[in-house]
């Protein structure tokens, strides 16, 4: 992973030899292993490239990379498939070699159509004065742009600035395809014209599915001197996933399971589905494709390969290379179980569990069958889960910290220890006070969340930042000790809810518009995931010099799930804890998981209790005043005390 940036000026009076201090600082946070700047000048424009590398595979390759013809490449991504990269090779150099050999724009598009994995990039084509840039289909890597000085300059960057003046001008580059700017023409016309090469799907019948994001949608928030146009040759990138299966069942879904639609979730209900031969095949196919996705994401990183036998035996001293954002819910439990299959057994795995603690609260909160207002009896935790919660809470030294995700996390830890007792599972209890939340939101986090600006973005962005920082308490046999996770790779379960009808709004849509409406909701979820979640989470996690990886958004996983009819992925006639993400729950049972397979969805902002920390009368979609960017004079707080 890297922090990449390109600052372009079309006026000599704005030429600069360096980036603004706060932007450079933010980029270096993302890439602690090497930093380099490169200046490319023409008569009428100047490009300042800056790249900061987090080394994760092959030989450390300093960026920007430049070839003998003056082409410059900045790459923030991982090639997991599509283009062959050997274990000892660096994907930046491999991709740049291919890119340098491309003879025309069609070959460039074909190259990026083949890449599977998360990416954003900037490519300067010297001979033609073109600047190419873009993000992968899902937008798993951040890239922002801002245009200023009435078209005399613009900037592309993985992350924005902390200062109030520029902060509001940054916007996310849409994950709509590749963009190309003719720098020489821009100087002549005085207007910045972005040529778009969109994502399109070509069916076997040679029918082209148009990109969802229209040119007008992309242009809507841009300044008047910036326009987005379709590329003149009408070329495109091939979408890396198949379209969503919109098929509807011939018989009403309710008739298959009407006798169990009003009972609490139990393992026996899931076992009924496992007796179906076809369903069992689908479950195994899902496990296989998701397992491969996890394998790619936990093995593509450097490890200590030359340890002595004695060093291998000292597993308590071994460093975890992989961490998981861990609530103990179904998504993180399945990811952890599959990661255990592929990570060397002598290597610990960090489970990062975050809780927000209001100091004035001294009484623990627990699951209460009668104290909570239940909408229906389907929300009552299963008997099996309640027993596991009680056992896990009794063993914890931080018993007063009992927010929902901490309770389910402790119970999930016990499940994982039962499934894989030889593994060292580092359950990292990360407790955040109101004071720490407010201080670090102001000095470090708010600019990472922006340009997103809602209450929901604030809650999730802050929770993910503290969780991925990995500073907390480790409960070990010898007692409780302070701990900081140094794992460079952080796995997250984003994408499971969107594809498998995990959100409460999916159930609402199903109840009002049936399976057809549910299909449309899932299609909409996948279409907007790049602008809703992924850029924000990449910026937040990357700020710690760590890389977010998303197994549920692996291209092959998404294509597999898209190919299935909706009723094989979810059955919302069934109660919470079973019907949503049904396929994932069945996979969890097959993998040997128990109580966690029945946990209903709980959003991170509620499970971690960050939503209870401040104003409780806000709506998730409200603009969040707490995300206002700080002024220049306050920047020194973070610079003096780096956390």
Swiss-Prot record:
Which top-level group of life is the source organism from? Eukaryota
Listed InterPro entries:
Asn_synthase, Asn_synthetase_domain, GATase_2_dom, Ntn_hydrolases_N, Rossmann-like_a/b/a_fold
Q: Which residues form the active site?
A: 2 (for gatase activity)
Record flagged with keyword Transmembrane: no
Instruction: Domain (Asparagine synthetase): give its ranges.
Output: 285-601
UniProt xrefs under PROSITE patterns? GATASE_TYPE_2 (PS51278)
In alphabetical order, the GO MF annotations are: asparagine synthase (glutamine-hydrolyzing) activity
Which part of the chain is the Glutamine amidotransferase type-2 domain?
A: 2-184
Biological process terms in GO annotation: adipose tissue development; asparagine biosynthetic process; skeletal muscle tissue development; transdifferentiation
Q: Record's Gene3D superfamilies?
A: Glutamine Phosphoribosylpyrophosphate, subunit 1, domain 1 (3.60.20.10), HUPs (3.40.50.620)
Q: Which key words are in the record?
A: Amino-acid biosynthesis, Asparagine biosynthesis, Glutamine amidotransferase
UniProt name for this protein: Asparagine synthetase domain-containing protein 1
Identify the species of origin: Homo sapiens (Human)
